[in-house]
Amino acid sequence: MSDKFHILLLNGPNLNLLGTREPEKYGYTTLTEIVSQLEAQAQGMDVVLSHLQSNAEHVLIDRIHQARGNTDFILINPAAFTHTSVALRDALLGVQIPFIEIHLSNVHAREPFRHHSYLSDIAVGVICGLGADGYNFALQAAVNRLSKSN
């Protein structure tokens, strides 16, 4: 790897609908806008940011597997897979890449089934309830952590 940090941003199911899907919960910012802002932030930090959004669990898992050996950190909004996917958990454990779990809404203030995450206990940290800003905070936290370890 080069001297730049390589960070992978993963977004799970239905996040492609951001901006129009339940904006009272998720806001009016689109995923394209979030990613564009993060790319600009990453460029200013000399970070290589890759992004994938998928509604398919296996596509996210395959991308996590591909990250092994060439990615320093993962930022993931697993969306509904948060509450259901042991497979995503196993993939993240398998590649041993540190990650931060991101949620736009405060999952703890929502329906009880959204309170459990299969990922949070193995994550470096969890950011929830801060809307699109949560992505910016996660990127900054990842870079801070990577900088301290180098």
From Swiss-Prot:
SUPFAM superfamilies xrefs: Type II 3-dehydroquinate dehydratase
Pathway: Metabolic intermediate biosynthesis; chorismate biosynthesis; chorismate from D-erythrose 4-phosphate and phosphoenolpyruvate: step 3/7
Catalytic residue positions: Y26, H103
Reactions listed under catalytic activity: 3-dehydroquinate = 3-dehydroshikimate + H2O
Family matches, as InterPro entries: DHquinase_II, DHquinase_II_CS, DHquinase_II_sf
Record-annotated site: Transition state stabilizer: R21
BP GO annotations: amino acid biosynthetic process; aromatic amino acid family biosynthetic process; chorismate biosynthetic process; quinate catabolic process
EC number in record: 4.2.1.10
Assembly mode: Homododecamer.
HAMAP family recorded: AroQ
Family: Belongs to the type-II 3-dehydroquinase family.
Function field: Catalyzes a trans-dehydration via an enolate intermediate.
Protein's name according to its UniProt entry: 3-dehydroquinate dehydratase
Organism of provenance: Yersinia enterocolitica serotype O:8 / biotype 1B (strain NCTC 13174 / 8081)
